[in-house]
């Protein structure tokens, strides 16, 4: 059985959703946070007991919607230097080899440089170490650190891959991820 809860805005809604998950229901809902690990902290700040979060949550997905660089008018972006890329988390090797693209504008994209949209997301699997960290009242940075050791990739990681693939331009990456 699947339950969809529009948005978890208060403790009562959270408790109902998580208790339904404990009874074997697959519960989908939304919660406004900047990233996946801070969803756990938000639930704690709403007064949800740690044992309930740890037992009921199996996965948290955080996402942003980005404009896709137009494939018809892509061209190298001369304004994005390796130094700028390194400042945004690219390795020196990635930054020196990267051919960063932008859309210059064409009839297909109505001179915007963008055509279509795509998701930039991160998926936090609630593994045993994450459950233990929740019960130990770990902070958001601590949860993120544990998750990264478990293979977690942030939205920034995914965004950097999309930039290197040419689908996301640097300005759009900065726009959607500077919201944090």
Model region roles, listed by residue range:
Residues 1-180:
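Short, flexible helix-loop junctions that flank or precede catalytic/ligand sites
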